[in-house]
Amino acid sequence: MKTFKEFIKEDMVAGDSGGNPENISIGTTSGAVVNKGPEQIPKKKKEESKEKEE
């Protein structure tokens, strides 16, 4: 059985092949993901209690 690192090939997961139809059909990627997203997940705003409305 393969280990997790052997199973996952991150550089093959993403990439748009530069928009080239031949590269897309062959499966060639233009590179790995470089945008890791936000550094911190924004906190959810708390709902105001219904007691204040009354």
Swiss-Prot record:
Residues 41-54 have a biased composition (Basic and acidic residues). Residues 13-54 are annotated as: Disordered. It comes from the Viruses. Residues 20-32 have a biased composition (Polar residues). This is Uncharacterized 5.9 kDa protein in Gp58-sp intergenic region. It comes from Enterobacteria phage T4.
